């Protein structure tokens, strides 16, 4: 391969970091050495310069517009990933009773609950789908009690499940991790106290975490011993610039939001996502001979993360069955990669395969995957 040559693009089904819109990548490439006539890359800009100020302001404005964020909410660009929010939420919200309600629908909600417990919060797991391998989202119509907040993970990347409803909370602030579904659908922000999303699945490269928080939940007095960097007020007061923000990631995030707007906003993107997911689920549910099956139950299926097994994943624990299952899964992933379909290996807790079809994944990518799956099934039935 010669310098300057570009390899053929693959379809990247990674759970995150994930694919970005090609036109956004091309635009960023054009501006790499000279952004907005400044004669410098965003990578080189001072975060307090007049060159960067409009970049972060634009990103914030686009979040507010596309997500219809009410004026009494702050938009923050933080660091530390979604996992840091597992601590920031209880440190800033568990201030009265010291109690919180968690609905446990997968690994990430479970980790969030464990982090809160570590900080001395009385955590009540009020519902869980662990009994069925997190293959569904339990229905909790209303959350009530002496809780400082209630916590959910709106989309579960590992298990491929998603909330089809928003629990009523009787005035209790509802916190939601929307890392893997942010702007994949319309969401009524006013029903939540805090929303947060790591950017690396649907918004930008890894490095920034979007936090949307109702202003009355931003306290001057978090739990004793809370580090300055883990206080929401620290960042709200400084416009997300208490310390140096991830400037380039925020720049790309703004470009992705512009792309989403051109696609019709959250509603337009959601329609495309439904079409992609339905195409794949239809094949999984109706493939000849039942070679494949989806793992998530109908009514809880994610539009973003589609998890599936082959007929060789029987649940048998004998050595021969396990060896055959491993062989087929490995063969599928390897041959898919050779066909330009990468990062399809399922999480170790579920096994099988996982196709993450986030906003930037085109329908053609899903169609290419299904065609490969048909061929693989014929050759390995």
Across the structure, where does each feature detected by a protein language model lie?
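PLP-dependent enzyme catalytic core of the Aspartate aminotransferase-like
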Residues: 4-5, 9-10, 331, 338, ...
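A glycine-/small-polar-enriched, mobile loop at the entrance of the PLP active site in fold-type I
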Residues: 9-60
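Conserved PLP-anchoring active-site segment centered on the Schiff-base-forming lysine
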Residues: 94-110
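Conserved active-site segment immediately N-terminal to the catalytic lysine
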Residues: 175, 189-200, 209
């Amino acid at each position: 391969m010669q310098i300057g040559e570009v390899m053929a693009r693959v379809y990247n089904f990674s759970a995150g970091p994930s694919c970005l819109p090609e036109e956004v990548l091309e635009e960023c490439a054009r501006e790499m050495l000279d952004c907005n006539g400044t004669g410098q890359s965003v990578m080189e800009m001072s975060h307090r310069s007049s060159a960067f100020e409009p970049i972060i302001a634009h990103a914030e404005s686009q979040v507010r517009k596309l997500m219809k964020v009410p004026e009494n909410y702050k938009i923050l660009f933080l660091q530390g990933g979604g996992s840091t929010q597992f601590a920031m939420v209880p440190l800033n919200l568990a201030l009265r009773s010291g109690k919180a309600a968690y609905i446990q629908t997968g690994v990430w909600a479970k980790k969030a609950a464990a982090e809160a417990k570590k900080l001395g919060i009385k955590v009540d797991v009020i519902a869980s789908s662990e009994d069925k391998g997190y293959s569904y989202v339990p229905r909790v119509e209303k959350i009530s009690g002496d809780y400082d907040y209630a916590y959910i993970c709106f989309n579960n990347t590992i298990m491929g499940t998603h909330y089809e409803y928003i629990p009523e909370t009787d005035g209790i602030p509802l916190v939601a991790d929307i890392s893997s579904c942010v702007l994949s659908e319309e969401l009524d922000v006013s029903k939540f106290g805090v929303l947060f999303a790591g950017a690396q699945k649907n918004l930008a490269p890894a490095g920034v975490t979007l936090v949307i928080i109702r202003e009355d939940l931003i306290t001057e007095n978090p739990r004793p011993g809370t580090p300055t960097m883990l206080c929401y007020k620290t960042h709200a007061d400084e416009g997300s610039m208490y310390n140096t923000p991830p400037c380039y990631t925020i720049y790309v995030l703004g470009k992705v939001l512009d792309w989403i707007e051109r696609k019709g906003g959250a509603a337009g993107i959601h329609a495309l996502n439904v079409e992609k997911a339905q195409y794949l689920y239809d094949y999984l549910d109706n493939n000849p001979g039942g070679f494949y099956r989806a793992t998530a139950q109908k009514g809880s299926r994610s539009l973003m993360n589609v998890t599936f097994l082959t007929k060789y994943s029987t649940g048998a624990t004998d050595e021969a069955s396990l060896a055959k299952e491993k062989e087929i899964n490995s063969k599928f992933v390897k041959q898919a990669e050779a066909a330009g379909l990468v990062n399809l290996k399922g999480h170790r807790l579920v096994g099988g395969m996982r196709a993450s079809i986030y906003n930037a994944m085109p329908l053609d990518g899903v169609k290419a995957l299904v065609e490969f799956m048909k061929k693989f099934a014929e050759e390995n039935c």
